[in-house]
């Protein structure tokens, strides 16, 4: 199993199994985030699922805490989406 590791521009370090990028659940969840017809509440729920699918519970919690530290205790959805975009576009 090959791992993708990296660090976002904001300094969050992560590692995940590269196979996740071709997993059915990953593609399905990502598709709902990109679909303009998907309700915003569903997109947020699916983004949470996608983060946990990629990073697992521990790294997801670490990411949210990382974002909170940079935003006076808040984790703005825009920042979470930005980090998720960087993580999923990373190639080893």
Protein language model regions, located:
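Short, surface-exposed, charged amphipathic helix/loop patches that serve as local interaction elements
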Residues: 20-92
């Amino acid at each position: 199993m090959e791992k993708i590791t990296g660090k976002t521009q904001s300094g969050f370090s992560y590692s995940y199994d590269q196979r996740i990028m071709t997993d059915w659940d990953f593609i399905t969840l990502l598709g709902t985030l990109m679909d303009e017809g998907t309700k915003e509440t569903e997109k947020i729920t699916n983004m949470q699922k996608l983060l946990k699918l990629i990073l697992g519970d521990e790294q997801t919690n670490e990411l949210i805490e990382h974002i909170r530290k940079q935003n006076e205790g808040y984790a703005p959805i825009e920042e979470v989406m930005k980090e998720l975009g960087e993580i999923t576009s990373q190639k080893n």
